[in-house]
Curated annotation (Swiss-Prot):
MF GO annotations: GTP binding; GTPase activity; magnesium ion binding
Domain OBG-type G: from-to ranges: 149-344
Database matches in CDD domains: Obg
UniProt organism field: Mus musculus (Mouse)
Family, similarity comment: Belongs to the TRAFAC class OBG-HflX-like GTPase superfamily. OBG GTPase family.
Cellular location(s): Nucleus, Nucleolus
Protein known as: GTP-binding protein 10
Keyword Nucleus in record: yes
Presence of the UniProt keyword Cell division in the record: no
Gene name of the encoded protein: Gtpbp10
GO biological process, one term: ribosome biogenesis
């Protein structure tokens, strides 16, 4: 068990999803008191989104992780107004949340060329500074990557999430018959006949206690924050992490996964959710499916079997429940159709909400 944990840490270390950098705006230029000349303002430091950039590439390219903008030009006889210092741009991947040392969000990079100002340059010397320049702002900045996708796959290890991703998209994640095969987020796209594309993120499997960062839970759970919908993937035969951990039925895994999301961030429970019940090719799968459906239809009749701390405050209501087999392909086409339908419905609701908001703004301004 310890050996597995060490391997997980080593391999996951190759994928960087958080980077701490030092930034400093440029100092202002000297003023020219005799002629009233003003020094140029120091350059600013910006974090800018680049499509093909990764945090690992950023770290390798700038191992010191220091980004300092240029100083403003001094005022002189031939140029009384000093020119502004050169800005410094920090290239970062799309999907970055930029925060300071106190956790305050400075901005987000949701698409290519989005930019966030992280350190301002100092003022140039002028009358109210006695023509003395000011230093630029210093700031420690955290770049936190959160995968952006339409659908995020949620499940315990070895539930078949990677196999499902390879079935519904052209992604080629590592697939094996043991836990923790996926050690970093994998992205794939579902392609439809009308050229519609839906992005799907396969996240490393969660374990009980993920909300407390067990099994790197925080590294994994945070990637669900920017997905529009959740797709739970559950093994119909249940789950057991190891011989020393309790066996969980399919129903128990759903309850526990819901609780983990709730304890990490309650907002995750407000996301629309679907359920894929995997491994329907196994013996007795149909019998277990009938039992699971009965439990899902009336969960309150079975929650007394759980410890109080394991019961979520609010049970998730799945928009669609689809039995599948990633081995035989059973239910895959239906699942893709349900994913499309659920997202189309969500698009419609978001459009209606946007139109209502615009109408209210027009009414209040008239």
């Amino acid at each position: 068990m310890v050996r597995c944990g060490c391997a997980l840490l080593r391999k996951y270390g190759n994928f960087i999803d958080n980077l701490r950098i030092f930034t400093k705006g440029g100092s202002g230029g000297m003023g020219y008191p005799r002629l009233g000349g003003e020094g140029g303002r120091g350059g600013d430091v910006w974090v800018v989104a680049h499509k093909n950039m990764t945090l690992k590439q950023l770290k390798n390219k700038y191992p010191q992780k220091r980004f300092v903008a240029g100083g403003g030009a001094n005022s002189r006889v031939s140029a009384l107004q000093g020119s502004k210092g050169k800005d410094c741009e920090v290239p970062a991947p799309v999907g970055i949340s930029v925060t300071d040392e106190n956790g305050q969000v400075l901005g987000e990079l949701n698409k290519e060329e989005d930019r966030v100002l992280v350190a301002k340059g100092g003022l140039g010397g002028k009358l109210h500074t006695n023509f003395l320049p000011l230093k630029g702002q210093k700031r420690i900045v955290h770049l936190d990557l959160k995968v952006i996708a339409d659908v995020g796959l949620v499940g315990f290890p070895n539930a078949g999430k990677s196999s499902l991703l390879s079935r519904v998209s052209h992604a080629t994640p590592v697939i094996a018959d043991y836990a923790f095969t996926t050690l970093r987020p994998e992205l794939g796209k579902i392609m439809y006949n009308d050229f519609k594309q839906i992005s799907v993120a396969d996240l490393p499997g969660l374990i009980e206690g993920a909300h407390m960062n067990k099994g790197m839970g925080h590294k994994f759970l945070k990637h669900l924050e920017r997905t529009r919908q959740l797709l739970f993937v559950v093994d119909i035969s249940g789950f057991q992490l190891s011989s020393v951990t309790p066996y969980r039925t399919a129903f128990e895994t759903i309850i526990l996964l819901t609780k983990e999301l709730e304890l990490y961030k309650e907002e995750l429970q407000t996301k629309p959710a679907l359920l894929a019940i995997n491994k329907m090719d196994l013996p007795d799968a149909q019998v277990k499916l009938q039992e699971l459906m009965k439990q899902l239809l009336s969960p309150e009749d079975f929650l007394h079997l759980f410890e109080t701390k394991m019961i979520p405050e609010k049970a998730l209501e799945f928009q669609h429940i689809v039995p599948i087999s990633t081995v035989t392909g059973e239910g895959i086409a239906e699942l893709k159709s349900c994913i499309r339908k659920a997202l189309d419905e969500q698009d419609g609701k978001e459009s209606d909400a946007h139109r209502s908001k615009q109408l209210l703004n027009l009414q209040s301004s008239s």
